[in-house]
Every structure is written in structure tokens, then in C-alpha cells.
């Protein structure tokens, strides 16, 4: 699988130049440029995992190196600092992002040609979480969501996957297609979490299919998982 690691260069130095009354401004600018990055990424059929904001990951199977270069140039035009990128390859998203990260730290920047793989996207949703807000505080609900995020992250890490919190009670994960059965085994009898699985040629398609799967689970109300494949 192919993962593009993106590092915002001198990001900390940029934030410090904004003065002491800066946290609100940092959040404003971060959200503004992330909105633009999401828009650009969607045009190239991928999806940014924003993680730390100053370091991003993208699953880029199904995208040529030429397209990646165009996408990176488009992003650079909309960021307040420079960016450094590196393309990593591995049998799993976790291995691929590790290789991409090592590449960034070694100051390499050449894009090698790698074989494209199908992508498995996972759209997780917590059952009854919205309803539970009637009986708990906003912050306690957030703590529960955070704890589940940690548990899901650890599980996916063990099978070579990566995870991003989407907001609300939703999470987005990526695994290799070889690990899909492990996900199904884990959540087939789970009455707390449902997972929509999508398999596609690129990240955007896989995510769309995962969301389609999740909607079918919600409509069915009997299954905890469903899979759609391109």
C-alpha cells in the first residue's frame, strides 16, 4: 500500500511569530487550510488524516506519481508554511506510513514507483452514543469517545491499520484487504460498535463505500458490520 507523509516545515516557528494571543488564531488558520486540503485531496480521490495538523498522512493507492506532484503543488499554494513530503510503501497502511515517516526524517524526497493495491476503509460508529448524551455530560461523553478511540487505535495497530477520529461518535480506519476478516471477527458480536467496510481502488471510493455499508447496517438494525466492494 502507498502512504504519503506530509510535514509542514517550520510550523512551530510560524505559530510563535503570531504573538502571545495566538491560540484562537492558530485554530482559525488550521481549520481554514485543512478545509482547503480536504477539497484538494478529494479532487485527487484521496483523504487527509490530519493527526497533528503539522503532520498529515494520505492513503494514495490509485494515484500516479505525476498526480501526487500536482496535488502537492496545489496544497503548497494554500499553506502558510512550506511542506515536505515522502511516499512510503508497505504491506499494510501502518508499515507504509512508517516507511514514509522514516523517509521524511532522512530528508529524502524522491518518489519511487510502487504497485497500487486496493484500499479497505472502515467507518466505525458507536451505538446509542447520541442518545446517551441525554443522561451524561458533554465532557463525560467526550471522554468515552476518546477511550474508544484509543481502544480502536490499539486494535488496528496490531493488524497493521491506522485510525482517524472524524468527530461526533465516528472514526475512520484503513487496513489492508488481507486484514478485513480480522476486523469482521472482532466486531461481528460487538453490540456497542458497528463498522461499515468499503473496498475500492482509491481512498475516496473506499470511504464512500464504507459509509454506504454503515447506512445499510443502520437500516438493517440486526448486523454489526457490512462490506461493499468496488
Swiss-Prot record:
Keyword annotations: GTP-binding, Hydrolase, Nucleotide-binding
EC number(s) from the headed UniProt entry: 3.5.4.29
Catalytic activity entry: GTP + 3 H2O = 2-amino-5-formylamino-6-(5-phospho-D-ribosylamino)pyrimidin-4(3H)-one + 2 phosphate + 2 H(+)
Disulphide bridges, residue numbers: none
GO molecular-function terms, A-Z: GTP binding; GTP cyclohydrolase IIa activity
Enzyme class, spelled out: hydrolase
Gene Ontology terms describing biological process: biosynthetic process
Domain of life, per lineage: Archaea
Gene3D superfamilies per the UniProt record, alphabetical: 3.30.70.270, Nucleotide cyclase
Record-stated family: Belongs to the archaeal-type GTP cyclohydrolase family.
PANTHER family assigned to the protein according to its UniProt record, in alphabetical order: GTP CYCLOHYDROLASE III
Function according to Swiss-Prot or TrEMBL: Catalyzes the formation of 2-amino-5-formylamino-6-ribofuranosylamino-4(3H)-pyrimidinone ribonucleotide monophosphate and inorganic phosphate from GTP. Also has an independent pyrophosphate phosphohydrolase activity.
Protein's UniProt name: GTP cyclohydrolase III
Species this chain originates from: Saccharolobus islandicus (strain M.16.27) (Sulfolobus islandicus)
Upper lineage: Archaea, Thermoproteota, Thermoprotei, Sulfolobales, Sulfolobaceae
Gene giving rise to this polypeptide: gch3
Amino acid at each position: 500500500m502507498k502512504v504519503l507523509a506530509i510535514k509542514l516545515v517550520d510550523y512551530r516557528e510560524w505559530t510563535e511569530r503570531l504573538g502571545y494571543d495566538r491560540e484562537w488564531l492558530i485554530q482559525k488558520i488550521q481549520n481554514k487550510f485543512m478545509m482547503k486540503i480536504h477539497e484538494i485531496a478529494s479532487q485527487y480521490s484521496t483523504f487527509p488524516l490530519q493527526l497533528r495538523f503539522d503532520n498529515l498522512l494520505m492513503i494514495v493507492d490509485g494515484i500516479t506519481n505525476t498526480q501526487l506532484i500536482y496535488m502537492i503543488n496545489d496544497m503548497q499554494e494554500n499553506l502558510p508554511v512550506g511542506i515536505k513530503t515522502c511516499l512510503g510503501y508497505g504491506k499494510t497502511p501502518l508499515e507504509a506510513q512508517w516507511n514514509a515517516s522514516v523517509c521524511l526524517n532522512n530528508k529524502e524526497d524522491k518518489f519511487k514507483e510502487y504497485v497500487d493495491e486496493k484500499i479497505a476503509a472502515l467507518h466505525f460508529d458507536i451505538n446509542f452514543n447520541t442518545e446517551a448524551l441525554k443522561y451524561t455530560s458533554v465532557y463525560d461523553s467526550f471522554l468515552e469517545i476518546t477511550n474508544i478511540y484509543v481502544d480502536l487505535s490499539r486494535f488496528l495497530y496490531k493488524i497493521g491499520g491506522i485510525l482517524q477520529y472524524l468527530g461526533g461518535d465516528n472514526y475512520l480506519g484503513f487496513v489492508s484487504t488481507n486484514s478485513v476478516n480480522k476486523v469482521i471477527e472482532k466486531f461481528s458480536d460487538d453490540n456497542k460498535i458497528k463498522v461499515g467496510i468499503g473496498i475500492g481502488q482509491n481512498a475516496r471510493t473506499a470511504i464512500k463505500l464504507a459509509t454506504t455499508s454503515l447506512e445499510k447496517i443502520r437500516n438493517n438494525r440486526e448486523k454489526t458490520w457490512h462490506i461493499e466492494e468496488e
